[in-house]
Amino acid sequence: MTTISTTTASSSSSSRGRVFHRRTHQSRRRLLRTTEVVQAQTSSSNDAMEEETFDVVIIGSGIGGLSAAALLAKYDLKVCCVESHEHAGGAAHEWKRDGFTFESGPSLYTGLSQFPTSNPLGQILHAIDEPLKCIRYNTWKVHFPEATFVTEVGNDQFIECLEKYYDAEAVADWRKLKEKMEPLAQASAALPPAAVRTDAYAAWTLARFIPGLFQSMPSLNAILSDYESFLDKNDINSKFIRDYMDLLCFLLSGGTSKATMGAEIGYMFADWYAPNAALEFPIGGSGALVDCLVRGFEKYGGDLRLRTHCEEILVEKKDGEEEEATGIVTKTRDGKKKILRARKAVISNATIWDTEALLRDCAEGRRQSVREASSTTRTTKSGKIVDDDVEFCQSFMHLHLGIDAANLPAAETLEMHHVWVGDWDKGVDAEQNLVLVSIPSIKDPSMAPEGKHVIHAYTPGNEPLARWKNVKYNSEEYSKLKKERSEVLYQAVAKALNNITVEDLRSRAEIEMVGTPVTHARFLRRGNSQGTYGGTGWIKKKESGDDSAAAVPVTSAKSNLKNLLLVGDSRFPGPGLPAVAAGGWAAAHELVDFRRQCEVLDKVVAR
């Protein structure tokens, strides 16, 4: 699951060896965007804005943007990726302070280091020849209303937990679910995102997967529908198993089973509950993952520009044809502006709502179409049009701690990952009812100084945006609300540390940082999207009497504006590392020859 940065990351000005581009720009007059005026600007060197030209310009270095960037550079395109922050990685970046390494986002990883893998992000790492060193493990601890216990992935130990803490119905339903999930998991992996393209040449890239697709036909409807319908159809009635699957869906997609596509949970189930499956943790944290993508991008000639903000997406009409994206205007922290032209495409890793705001001189209808292209539409038998609009996910509260571990239990007796649920009846998406705790220094001691632990606790996408909408950053109201809303995080961390008191935990804290939806909006440039975790709403359980076909969103980077592609957590399939990496594959394969795509498929997909 990918979470969102909530800190300034100001503790380290290091950028892992990146070069900040601080070229001298000439002053500019008001930017006019028609082709004729851009040509006229060159008549005055004092008035003209400096320009550079690339094949592709990418806005934002989140995992979706970096995935597309690294793949396109691998395909020999000239690519520039601009990032407002001083660190690459977007919601997955990390920063250091006083020897502690803090992760802003992801905490649970699978399928990144082994080969073959069904994880689209793991496949990208293989494609660009950037292996990621990971620690493999298989346990996590849950703190549920009924019981607290350690459970495992990759075997049947969960059955033992069900037998000990729950009832016979839960055991029977879990056994049944594992059996029913096997064909769903196989169907979910039958067509990797790396094979998809939207032109006629898809016949070539998809050909090798046709046999697997035919074998998966009986499960096709299930992978394209909401997962709750799958549970209903297979008579999974145990309240705990239904609650538990809601939890897994929410951690995966930001929605419960009624709002999660069967294919998504199929991928996850294959990764977690296949024999000998394991969780992974990148040595060095999420920053090591980001570094792999950046190294791959740069070694193939990519140009990453940090501290470089996109002010605007340029939209022009050429020769009287339809509007198209032709480049961007950037602004560095010293106030200098530059035009970066794109021969083939502009790719935005900003949210669809924040991308819309960058289309300043685009026709109103075109601006709206950026958002509408991310929705799904279906038609009922009676001819009624039903729009399933993309919606905001809620946001996060985050707690980052660097603590003194003196007299705490030894690291080998503690678990790295903890999940706390307050009340199943409220629902896992209820505010303040679900907390995740990650203590990465338990598995990777390099994440904290000797004798210390680094901790990240967060409410994963269930903090209401509306509660923070009109709260001013650093106001008295903000400080009070931040303290109030972070209390549940302290309580969950205290439980994770073998039930120490909150007072003991606070006394151990050497570094303490609390993040809110407001810090999401500020540091991830999500002002128009209010600090959201990403998008949701593409998968909706049909209401009684709705005779429409299921709305089937497709992993596509296309927008309704020519040469503007969209990636990231506000596009289907939504938040999460595998999901946004799938968007990176989709964007890259809108722009490259199918024969090059087939070469990469030979490399990353096991036959």
Question: Over which residues does each language-model region extend?
Answer:
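N-terminal glycine-rich phosphate/pyrophosphate-binding loop and immediately adjacent elements
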Residues: 48-193
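A conserved FAD-binding loop/helix module that cradles the flavin
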Residues: 106, 569-592
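Mid-domain catalytic core of redox enzymes
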Residues: 281-282, 302, 308-449, 558
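A glycine-rich dinucleotide-binding beta-alpha-beta segment and adjacent secondary-structure elements
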Residues: 241-257, 436, 498-573
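Short beta-strand to alpha-helix junction loop
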Residues: 215-226, 273-299, 305-307, 477-485
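C-terminal segments that line or cap access tunnels to active or ligand-binding sites in enzymes
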Residues: 404-515
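N-terminal chloroplast transit peptides
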Residues: 1-27
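Rossmann-like flavin
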Residues: 145-260
